């Protein structure tokens, strides 16, 4: 029996990619698709909208509750405000939730995850999450004798800075080095000399760059670089669908991440 997956934010860059990935994956089927209230696409079939030549029998709705009720698991790529509504619906309908929404500071995911399974990751790419494990290992092996610089570049419409993925890399380094992440961030906006063990962030925005990340460990003799470049958003969509399948099969309440999959 196929897993029924709902998609919140179905008309966004990621939403369309996820719908197409669901169409091609034999383990799942689309249960419903949500767009923002007032969208001109409400009531239309998702088939032509995602580039399919025929209707798929699924009409776009603005009702988050409706899609949660009809789904086995739901994938959300929206905004902080919309994700909050998804969290409430997940608890109400007792359905697992996968979310890649970033910029969610202030949302206490653990409170909701105590009642339903929730998987949140700033980046759903399998490659990025493998890189995250490598960064943790490098930080352990190199110790705090190296300055750590994390650079990221995204398209010119991305709002949060640094990216959620870059912050995850920074936290991974801090945890491995057993230092406080908040106290060891180095800001390039001040004139202070960089202290030992600082974790710096550099941000670039331009064009349609999907996502480039580089974590550098630097001392006076050498530089170790670990890099990832996203070529197509399909990598995030494929990871999100894999996460939905995994979470639905797991079904134990708790807060998970893509690190639990790789």
From Swiss-Prot:
Cross-referenced CDD domains: DHDPR_N
- Family label: Belongs to the DapB family.
Q: Which reaction does it catalyse?
A: (S)-2,3,4,5-tetrahydrodipicolinate + NAD(+) + H2O = (2S,4S)-4-hydroxy-2,3,4,5-tetrahydrodipicolinate + NADH + H(+); (S)-2,3,4,5-tetrahydrodipicolinate + NADP(+) + H2O = (2S,4S)-4-hydroxy-2,3,4,5-tetrahydrodipicolinate + NADPH + H(+)
The residues the record assigns to binding NAD(+) are: 9-14, 100-102, 121-124
Q: Which SUPFAM superfamilies match?
A: Glyceraldehyde-3-phosphate dehydrogenase-like, C-terminal domain, NAD(P)-binding Rossmann-fold domains
Please tell me where (S)-2,3,4,5-tetrahydrodipicolinate binds in this chain: 155, 164-165
The protein's organism comes out as Wolbachia pipientis subsp. Culex pipiens (strain wPip)
Give the keywords, sorted.
Answer: Amino-acid biosynthesis, Cytoplasm, Diaminopimelate biosynthesis, Lysine biosynthesis, NAD, NADP, Oxidoreductase
Active-site residues, record numbering mapped to chain: 154, 158
Name the enzyme group at the top EC level: oxidoreductase
- A Pfam match is DapB_N
Give binding positions for NADP(+): 36
The entry's protein name is 4-hydroxy-tetrahydrodipicolinate reductase
């Amino acid at each position: 029996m196929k897993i029924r997956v709902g998609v919140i934010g179905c008309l966004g860059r990621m939403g369309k990619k996820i719908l197409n990935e669901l169409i091609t994956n034999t383990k799942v089927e689309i249960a419903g698709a949500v767009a923002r209230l007032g969208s001109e696409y409400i009531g239309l079939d998702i088939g032509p909208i995602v580039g399919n030549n025929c209707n798929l029998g699924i009409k776009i709705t603005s009702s988050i509750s409706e899609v949660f009720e009809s789904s086995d698991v739901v994938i959300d790529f929206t905004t902080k405000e919309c994700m909050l509504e998804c969290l409430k619906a997940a608890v109400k309908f007792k359905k697992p939730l996968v979310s890649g929404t970033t910029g969610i500071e202030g949302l206490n995911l653990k409170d909701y995850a105590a009642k339903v399974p929730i998987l949140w990751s700033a980046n759903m790419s399998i490659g990025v999450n493998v890189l995250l494990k490598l960064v943790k290992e490098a930080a352990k092996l190199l110790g705090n004798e190296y300055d750590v610089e994390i650079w990221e570049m995204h398209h010119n419409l991305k709002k949060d800075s640094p990216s959620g993925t870059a912050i995850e890399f920074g936290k991974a380094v801090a945890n491995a080095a057993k230092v406080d992440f908040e106290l060891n961030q180095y800001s390039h906006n001040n004139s202070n000399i960089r202290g030992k063990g600082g974790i710096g962030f550099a941000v670039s925005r331009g064009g349609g760059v999907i996502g480039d990340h580089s974590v550098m460990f630097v001392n006076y003799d050498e530089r170790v670089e670990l890099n990832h470049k996203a070529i197509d958003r399909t990598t995030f969509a494929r990871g999100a669908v894999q996460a939905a399948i995994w979470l639905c099969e797991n079904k134990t309440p708790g807060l998970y991440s893509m690190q639990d999959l790789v």
